[in-house]
């Protein structure tokens, strides 16, 4: 048995032909959908990048207990479990967060790994002097970082070395993935995880892909949107063209993997999972990107395609709710390994085969933001009560953040907390925290009916439906052994 994961970043399903888009040129995603089950209700869990990857390893939510950070000593790791069972696991990635403080122990769980440098503001190429930066329409406010450490500055330093398609990190990632398949296709018992940061912003690609779209933009350079939309309609259209161009580049590289699946008849004995960690807002709801606003479906409901050689389902749509916490149990089940007790996800074999549901509801969110729940029809977003936005704490035995250590003042306020039901009997550090994305809770509670309002333009007010969704939310939070202050923060009465 073999398996391949292709993991993209910030892939918005509304820009893919299998999900109804008529503008993006992505024939290989169409080709994939014809040879796999396509999921219409695949939701995020813990947001964004590394919290999602922690779910990929552990098969359980983590955003209620801690912000972005490393795997914990008590975390189960699917790639490591497979490795210990004699199944070779290999990671290929250009996802720069793996070599930041808060991601530095994920890749070590694989049998081997290959990293490609240069995406976004990866601190890759040195430039003591100022790199050449053209006039731009708008500098991404949250990305500048200040001084020589800022993502903005480093991204432009890197771009000097990324000019031809062969130079791009995405290309190099898929080169390495193809090399692995060429070398190992006849071997048995392996998992290959190929992941690229694209089509994450900045939307930088070659003219070959940009020329596929009728972009009439005549203004200054602009490929890195952020925050609230303040640009003209022309600028919004320009960004969407650049995003589509980058998706087309992703599509070409997806096709390279599909070609090798055909060439070596890997469809016979190889599971293929193609998905993303989260989506991306491209001006919808008046926002760019993610995190600073409610998790609308453009970010939360993501593309997912799975080929399972056991059921050999091709060209079918699946409506049942699934999440990234299901990927680890699905792969463990596929390789005939036990699914551990602390994993909350479910193996997806039955959904793939016959759309048999595995859950009533899906929990999702980001640490300190809304706690969201969906049953497939309704989405309920529960915000912190006014004045309680900062009533939250990190629970961890790895006191490291995304790209920084905890400072002395923060650690001076820590206390020792009793074990949770997933910490293997270990006590954990409780470190008081604050609302991470300023103002995210100010949107208040939101309830959407996806059947009548799939674009989530008109929140509804229905006490009976809200009460039912609150009960579902509380049940899922209890199953996750959520900290007591989460209920207080959200104004939930729990017996």
Regions from the PLM with identified roles:
Residues 55-163, 290, 365-366:
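Catalytic-site neighborhoods of secreted/periplasmic enzymes
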Residues 168-185, 223-272, 334:
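A long, amphipathic alpha-helix that forms part
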Residues 1-5, 103-114, 120, 150-155, ...:
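Active-site regions of oxyanion-processing enzymes, predominantly non-cytosolic
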Residues 24, 202-214, 260-316, 323:
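Histidine-centered active-site microenvironments of extracellular/periplasmic hydrolases
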Residues 57, 229-237, 255-259, 263, ...:
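Substrate-binding rim/cap in mid-to-C-terminal beta-strand-loop elements of soluble/periplasmic
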Residues 1-37, 46, 83, 443, ...:
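Active-site-proximal N-terminal segment of extracellular/periplasmic enzymes that hydrolyze or transfer
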Residues 102-152, 194-234, 303, 387-430:
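Core domains of carbohydrate- and sulfate-ester-processing enzymes
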Residues 297, 367-461:
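C-terminal, low-complexity/hydrophilic appendages and adjacent surface loops
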